[in-house]
Amino acid sequence: MSPCENDTPINWKRNLIVAWLGCFLTGAAFSLVMPFLPLYVEQLGVTGHSALNMWSGIVFSITFLFSAIASPFWGGLADRKGRKLMLLRSALGMGIVMVLMGLAQNIWQFLILRALLGLLGGFVPNANALIATQVPRNKSGWALGTLSTGGVSGALLGPMAGGLLADSYGLRPVFFITASVLILCFFVTLFCIREKFQPVSKKEMLHMREVVTSLKNPKLILSLFVTTLIIQVATGSIAPILTLYVRELAGNVSNVAFISGMIASVPGVAALLSAPRLGKLGDRIGPEKILITALIFSVLLLIPMSYVQTPLQLGILRFLLGAADGALLPAVQTLLVYNSSNQIAGRIFSYNQSFRDIGNVTGPLMGAAISANYGFRAVFLVTAGVVLFNAVYSWNSLRRRRIPQVSN
């Protein structure tokens, strides 16, 4: 038992603050190494333009792939042993792997360690599950929206800090600095997160079929998982072509990298501002209304992105898109809370994370394939079509959920 734990009631607001800090630190740690990942791959002996592109893509994607595979296992363990234990396991495990990455001598070692990083991850979904099971239901939207800004903040600041550190100290030391950040996250979680959890034996655990039958509406839960996947596909599809699209719009300018970085980061800034506010609004009017409205708003913003003529126009549209995106995942998570029990929260949030990771892998592949065959502008139109399908699918699933409630 940590020093912060005693018999007094759990202060969920303090836990939310500490969990936010943990998500910020892990978000920053993950993104610290992203700016120079291809450079590190090259330093490990990969040469040639095509080989470098291939290996950079593989080592980037394999983390999400293995995270998708491992998340349900960790979610089940969280429901048995407690969510705090999973937070500690994730932070410490990732910290150790980061140290080993800094010591890697060839690309195969690095690839295995990137896969191991995915296997040992899971801080954010377990933080979501912890807060979701402690916060009052009528504040779920605000709490989960606020929590989501932690990871976004870390992901925004991480690349800038990582680039500066790599320029100042070299590539390998950044991995050791990242490990230190994760170890700090471990100790903050150990001493300041409180959870009253009664461990459940393996025999008492609900099996998959029992988990499904315990749900109020299994089809709705599945539709929310699909929505999470499509949200990440839509976000990731634009990532591979954004810099090239900005260069096409900007023409011959010397600071295209800076402009691209600004346009890449503005959605995150907008999400930081919108997520808590729209989450609070969702607590008042219903997260399903926020979800459908934000999806439709996203479609209406993605279509004109295909027709912009300047980087400024693209930047404004992406800022507005970020404001809508800031509401999407918290709304999905709030609906998951409303439609499942605390007993299975760890698994539900982990399954959702698996779908999110699959979207992180498939989104960039989809964007790259479309741009290679039809050009950059087609990516935005196809992505708008995918999000429109998601809006119709989600609306239909949520409408069916309301019909029995009205008849009753």
UniProtKB/Swiss-Prot annotation:
Coiled coil: none annotated. It is a multi-pass membrane protein. It is found in: Cell inner membrane. The keyword Transmembrane helix applies. The chain crosses the membrane at residues 16-36, 58-78, 92-112, 115-135, 146-166, 173-193, 221-241, 256-276, 290-310, 378-398. InterPro entries: MFS (IPR011701), MFS_dom (IPR020846), MFS_MdtG_subfamily (IPR050497), MFS_trans_sf (IPR036259), Mutidrug-R_MdtG (IPR023692), Tet-R_TetA/multi-R_MdtG-like (IPR001958). PROSITE patterns: MFS. Keywords: Antibiotic resistance, Cell inner membrane, Cell membrane, Membrane, Transmembrane, Transmembrane helix, Transport. GO terms for cellular component: plasma membrane. HAMAP family: MFS_MdtG. This is Multidrug resistance protein MdtG. It comes from Escherichia coli (strain SMS-3-5 / SECEC).
